[in-house]
A protein has these predicted regions:
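Bacterial Sec-dependent N-terminal signal peptides
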Residues: 1-25
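Beta-propeller blade termini and top-face loops
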Residues: 25-747
Length: 747
């Protein structure tokens, strides 16, 4: 008997706190409220029709609207009923308890039920694809073969051979998001991680502003401990930068959305030395007592190793919202500043000082070097709030590289710029994945970068770039499907990196762009497949994944889909007929193998979009459709629908999945999000007057995101949760951890 568990989608991060225009960010405020943020965002942009429409355009995928929708989709099922966010340490505490419980369960499980998880990929990254988002890169001084990568949703990764292979030891940390990483200049085995996701904020529970603080390793990353910068409460902190003094390595500076924190004892204790939303920090190359920091439109200086800070008087206008800075040993008095305008988030100008910040002049203000097109002429949906970085050659202060959506290069100190890399392959420029978050010179000719797709390197000052992302297991999957005829065939939709198709071991290719979302493979004939990007832009294959063409989308339905728009194959009631396909927008749409779509529902409340679809394998025509307000069931392929009644206190808005029994359509299970104690229910009489049994015993109070039933088993269910996988059956009667070999991640 074969069972292919399609629930195992390792998000390695899924949207948390979208770092929008600062008026929607938290900026260190206590107890942000989901509904307040949501209301403020839509109020600001509801009248900007041109902005809203272009933000949804696939070609403009990185607008603020786009990032906000990532965040909203993830959190609307996880916040408390009053809109408050759960305390960051809830999962930490539960995780530690469940880890101890998991160790005990290993000794009690039957041999056949012991997990045997292994990575399927993608580990070999195709051209035009990507591994996942890398926020920061660090190379210890004098050790060019050692590379540390800070993944937005996959923890910290280390290469000891210049990026040929990668390893991680952070799979069991309480957060999988890392913004910045550095090592002790005197001892590279001492490593510091600034946890969370300060800029993109699309990360698992360590995301901005839910950082758990600064963590430390003294053995090269084999083990990790918490430092004195330890966020135990609902602190809403986002850490952006960590620096270690080069001669007195007991001094550590950490920048974040609540200021600059300084330790003088190697991280045992910290004191806040500056209050503000700090985005970047650098040390003066020839004087370790002098540090620079940026906050909003201002640059600050400390002349006593970070103890006291004063503002540098520059001519940078107050309309600037974010500044990235760089220094170089080739001209130690120089400071270079790349800026983005607040609100529009396009290029705000390139500024430079050659006397330690006393005087400033402006280099280029055009073209838009942080935009998306080759010419730098685009103006819509800019994202200087998200990706903004700069690096200056260590031996030539005129050679400067900056990162936005692409990489641009200047050979005259920032007065003029030319595009160096482009986010689309084969366009006359070297290809580097879109959205550049970090740039670092390793030496005078070698530069390394972290992007939404992973890690890339040039050894000839940008003439050619090599992707080093193979082996980085940090892809942020939303959904996956597996062929029931060819178990090697897998489709997965991933954040930032489209939809990937696996045809065999280590054989992956990207088949659909945008953010990869839901997908489906016909269980009867796997030559039929569907893939999608955000809000229901579907592609269809009729040749087993060799090619895909556009299928249903909001232009056809005149209905916008949910951020993750569901699609479902279902058996046809006509004997021998091809499978049916259902897609959920505001209503349910249906097609057969011919590909013609028809609406098959007319639900009330047209403002609510369908979040879930599920069919009964044993009874053709039986389908459940669920939106934020209600859930409905049909037994006749959508001709008539009945509203489902759930247990008291369980609303459709917090249901995350429906799973039918494979041979009895009267039985199905539901899973519940949020942090309450009621997590899984079963009904034996599906319909409008269903009765329910609570099957939550043994499940911790965490979001349960999906359920799968194992055929030909003693009613064995698997549950994907915010803390991995659990299972239960008639012999266990309670949920048992099933995580041996899995990282600590959302399933």
């Amino acid at each position: 008997m074969k069972i292919f568990l399609s629930l195992i989608v390792l998000f390695f991060a899924i949207p948390l706190i979208a770092e929008k225009d600062p008026k929607f960010r938290f900026d260190g405020k206590e107890s942000p409220n989901f509904f307040d943020i949501q209301k403020a965002f839509y109020k600001e942009y509801s009248e900007k029709t041109d902005f809203m429409q272009s933000s949804k355009d696939e070609s403009n995928k990185e607008g603020m609207f786009y990032h906000f929708k990532r965040w909203e989709w993830f959190w609307k099922q996880r916040v408390l009923p009053d809109g408050e966010f759960p305390q960051p340490m809830i999962l930490q505490d539960i995780y530690q308890k469940e880890l101890r419980r998991s160790q005990k369960s290993k000794t009690e499980q039957a041999l056949s039920l012991k997990p045997n998880w292994k990575i399927l990929g993608p580990t070999n990254i195709p051209i035009g694809g990507g591994a996942g988002r890398v926020n920061g890169i660090h190379i210890p001084a004098g050790q060019q073969n050692i590379i540390w990568a800070a993944a937005a949703g996959g923890g910290a990764w280390k290469s000891t051979n210049g990026g040929k292979t990668w390893q991680t030891t952070t799979d069991k940390l309480g957060t999988l998001g890392v913004t910045d990483i550095t090592t002790d200049p005197k001892n590279p085995n001492i490593v510091y991680l600034a946890t969370g996701d300060a800029f993109g904020a699309d990360t698992y529970y360590g995301a901005a502003p839910f950082s758990i603080g600064l963590i430390k390793s003294v053995d090269g990353g084999l083990t990790w401990t918490q430092t004195g910068l330890n966020y135990q409460q609902k602190d809403t902190r986002a850490l952006s930068r960590v620096l270690v003094h080069p001669t007195n390595t007991s001094i550590i500076l950490v920048g974040g959305n609540n200021g600059i924190h300084r330790s003088t004892d190697g991280g045992v204790t910290f004191n806040t030395r500056f209050v503000g939303d700090v985005k970047d920090m650098e040390m003066k190359p020839d004087d370790p007592s002098v540090y620079y920091a940026t906050s909003g439109s201002k640059i600050y200086i400390s002349r006593d190793a970070g103890d006291k800070w004063t503002e540098l008087k520059s001519n940078i206008p107050t309309t600037i919202g974010r500044i990235a800075i760089a220094v170089t040993p080739a001209e130690p008095e120089a400071i270079f500043a790349l800026t983005a305008k607040r609100g529009s988030w396009d290029f705000g100008g390139f500024y430079r000082s050659y006397d330690g910040g006393e005087n400033w002049d402006i280099g280029a203000t055009t073209p838009n070097i942080i935009g998306r097109n080759l010419q730098g002429t685009d103006t819509e949906n800019q994202q200087g709030w998200y990706d903004l970085c700069i690096a200056v050659s260590p031996d030539n202060p005129d050679l400067i590289f900056i990162g936005g959506i692409n990489i641009w290069r200047s050979t005259n100190g920032g007065s003029n710029w030319s595009i160096n890399t482009y986010w689309v392959p084969n366009q006359g420029r070297p290809y580097v994945h879109a959205d550049v978050h970090d740039l670092d010179f390793i030496n005078s000719t070698t530069i390394i970068t972290g992007t939404d797709g992973g890690v890339s390197l040039t050894t000839n000052r940008g003439l050619a770039w090599t992707d080093l992302s193979d082996g980085l297991e940090i892809t942020q999957f939303y959904r996956m499907s597996i062929s029931q005829q060819r178990p090697d065939v897998v489709i997965g939709g991933a954040q930032d990196n489209g939809t990937s198709y696996r045809s065999g071991p280590n054989e992956w290719k990207q088949v659909w762009g945008g953010d990869g979302m839901d997908n489906a493979i016909d269980p009867v004939n796997d030559k039929y497949m569907f893939v999608s990007s955000q809000n229901g832009n579907f592609g269809r294959s009729t040749n087993g994944g060799s090619s895909f063409s556009s299928s249903i989308n909001s232009a056809i339905t005149s209905e916008e889909g949910e951020w993750v728009t569901p699609i479902e194959f279902a058996p046809n009631a006509k004997p021998g007929a091809a499978s049916l396909v259902y897609a959920g927008y505001r209503d349910v749409w249906k097609t057969d193998s011919l590909g013609f779509w028809n609406k098959t529902s007319n639900f009330p409340n047209k403002q609510s979009r369908i979040m879930l679809l599920a069919h009964a394998p044993s009874r053709p025509g039986t389908l459940i459709a669920s939106n934020f307000n209600a859930s409905y069931i049909t037994y006749d392929e959508g001709q008539t629908w009945r509203q489902i009644q759930f247990p008291n206190g369980i609303a459709s808005s917090i249901i995350t999945s429906f799973e039918f029994h494979p041979s009895n359509d009267s039985i199905f299970w539901i899973s519940i999000s949020g942090f309450g104690s009621r997590k899984v229910f079963q009904t034996n009489n599906a319909g409008t007057n269903s009765t329910w049994t609570d099957l939550s015993g043994g499940m911790p109070p965490i979001p349960v995101n999906c359920l799968r039933y194992q055929p030909n088993s003693p009613d064995r269910l698997y549950a994907g949760t915010d803390l991995g996988v659990y299972y239960r059956d008639n012999s266990t009667k309670v949920w048992i951890p099933y995580n041996d070999g899995l990282p600590n991640t959302v399933i």
